[in-house]
């Protein structure tokens, strides 16, 4: 087998800020409430900048704070120039940018331009008449009719958050408009050059000129649709509407649009950070890697979802998995990006997924929760790619308690999924209260709600989420906040928070973490995830015990010579285990990183 360094492009190990920085995602409604109204806000974020800087954060990715009706948690934007009143004012964001730059930190904003809100002025104008100048900013199509004369939408596409149509009828102009997400989120028509120029000038340049340092581009691979909008393949004959992504994900002009965006906007602002969200892609490297090849001049990094789907897809239909599956996916992305010269994003959590310590670790006891949270931190911090940490991940925040009822799951995806399934089961069984335990199990394991409850700052009422007053938070605080919070962990050298801080510093001190060529060890081992990273003269061995058992791991010859260890870090106190024998005695959920 050829060694990776013989086939990886030279630019893969070229140093760059966007590769080495630690990016921390802030979900503003749930981060910190400065004014006591129960909703997190921009001033709350400003109040915690020193905490984030001390942790080792270089960049904040700020989820949407724009003016919005909040049908879909702010991703339905009605004004890209205004800040929603619940979060503060434009002056507050200007202050946030200034305070971050003063601390040598950067701000990445969420760019949501596959769709907007139906209350955005563009759409308000668009639906007034068929000859309105903004009509073609969106996808409008005429109705069809069945053989019985029933009005039908233009095609059989299904929207993402329900089993219903991706088309909504508009009475005023007697046509349908396309919405891949909620009906309140009409899709923008990127085929229209006037729309594209408005995005570049009125949104992107407007924010970059205010000091924004880059964009996380929401579902950016959906902006190009096959213009004829053909019917989707029928995957489920029992469903009236079908998954549309064959004709709207990674569409025929998506690379053309992103190249144009780079030429018109991104190339004119040096040192920007760009990352594109690329769902519904079936993990095809030939499709995904071109987005991030430097010579293509599109994006720096992407978010891929294969690792996130190892425990089940669709998201709310969980399944068990073997460690070897998790290792194979992680390793394939490490190696393929190296071979092809692309760049990874490393993450286990964001606002759309459940908590990593509950999914990939073990939160059944405090001891296991601490150990596995540290183990996952060690893994992420030693993989090649741009590292993302989600708020609360650094203190091992866990999934919502299993005794919480469906009413506490307030995300639109959770509520719609539960309501639709309940209606189907009522109709089928005739029972007023059919068994929904399997649906609740899916929500308890993987709902987006788990990432969205308030950040746990201390053990005061509501976890110190509100800096003033005792207003009820917009979402219920986790029951365990008195035991799991920043204040309790920040002074404890053995805490998860302290380990994250040490691990982030370790990553910055050892470039093999970020740039090292990757070799998986023992791929079939269902208990230990081990790999080697190599960068210039530095060689790093990572050994992760993913079980609650003590065991002996035999180091394969690819682990290399371990007789001269120059540095190490692990999630247990005490001296480094003896490695010269070729075996490592591992404690439950032990993580061990050694540098030679």
Task: Please identify what each model-predicted range represents.
Residues 2-596:
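Active-site and adjacent substrate-binding regions of carbohydrate-active enzymes
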């Amino acid at each position: 087998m050829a060694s990776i360094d013989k086939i990886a492009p030279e630019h893969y190990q070229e140093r760059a800020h966007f590769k080495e920085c630690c990016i921390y995602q802030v979900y503003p409604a749930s981060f910190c409430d400065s004014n006591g109204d129960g909703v997190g806000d921009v001033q709350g974020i400003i109040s915690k900048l020193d905490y984030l800087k001390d942790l080792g954060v270089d960049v904040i990715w700020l989820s949407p704070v724009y003016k919005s009706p909040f049908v879909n948690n702010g991703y339905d934007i009605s004004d890209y120039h205004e800040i929603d009143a619940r979060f503060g004012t434009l002056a507050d964001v200007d202050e946030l940018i200034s305070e971050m730059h003063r601390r040598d930190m950067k701000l990445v904003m969420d760019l949501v331009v596959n769709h907007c809100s139906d209350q955005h002025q563009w759409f308000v104008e668009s639906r007034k008449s068929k000859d309105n100048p903004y009509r073609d900013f969106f996808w409008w199509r005429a109705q069809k009719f069945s053989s019985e004369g029933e009005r039908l939408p233009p095609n059989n596409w299904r929207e993402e958050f329900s089993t219903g149509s991706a088309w909504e009828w508009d009475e005023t102009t007697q046509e349908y408009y396309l919405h891949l997400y909620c009906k309140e989120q009409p899709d923008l028509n990127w085929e229209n050059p006037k729309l594209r120029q408005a995005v570049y000038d009125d949104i992107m340049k407007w924010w970059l000129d205010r000091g924004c340092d880059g964009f996380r581009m929401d579902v950016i691979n959906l902006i190009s649709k096959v213009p004829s909008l053909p019917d989707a393949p029928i995957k489920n004959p029992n469903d009236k509407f079908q998954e549309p992504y064959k004709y709207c994900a990674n569409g025929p002009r998506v690379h053309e649009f992103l190249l144009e965006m780079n030429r018109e906007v991104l190339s004119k602002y040096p040192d920007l950070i760009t990352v594109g969200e690329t769902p519904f892609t079936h993990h095809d490297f030939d499709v995904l890697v071109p987005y991030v090849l430097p010579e293509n001049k599109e994006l720096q990094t992407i978010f891929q979802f294969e690792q996130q789907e190892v425990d089940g897809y669709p998201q709310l239909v969980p399944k068990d998995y073997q460690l070897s599956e998790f290792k194979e996916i992680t390793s394939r992305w490490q190696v393929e990006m190296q071979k092809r010269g692309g760049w990874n994003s490393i993450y286990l959590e964001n606002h759309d997924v459940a908590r990593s310590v509950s999914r990939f670790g073990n939160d059944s006891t405090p001891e296991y929760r601490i150990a596995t949270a540290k183990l996952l931190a060690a893994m992420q911090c030693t993989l090649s790619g741009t590292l993302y940490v989600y708020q609360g991940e650094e203190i091992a925040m866990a999934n919502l308690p299993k005794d919480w009822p469906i009413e506490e799951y307030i995300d639109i995806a959770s509520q719609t999924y539960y309501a639709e399934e309940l209606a189907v089961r009522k109709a089928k069984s005739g029972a007023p209260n059919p068994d929904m335990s399997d649906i609740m199990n899916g929500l308890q394991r993987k709902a987006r709600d788990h990432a969205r409850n308030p950040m746990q700052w201390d053990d005061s009422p509501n976890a110190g989420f509100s800096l003033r007053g005792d207003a009820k938070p917009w979402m219920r605080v986790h029951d365990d906040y008195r035991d799991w919070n920043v204040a309790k962990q920040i002074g404890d050298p053995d805490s998860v928070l302290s380990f994250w801080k040490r691990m982030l510093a370790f990553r910055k001190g050892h470039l093999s973490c970020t740039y090292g060529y990757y070799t998986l060890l023992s791929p079939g081992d269902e208990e230990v995830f081990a790999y080697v990273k190599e960068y210039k003269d530095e060689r790093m061995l990572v050994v992760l015990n993913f079980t609650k058992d003590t065991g002996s791991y035999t180091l394969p010859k690819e682990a290399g010579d371990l007789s001269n260890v120059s540095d190490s870090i692990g999630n247990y106190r005490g001296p480094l285990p003896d490695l010269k024998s070729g075996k490592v005695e591992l404690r439950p959920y032990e993580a061990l990183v050694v540098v030679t």
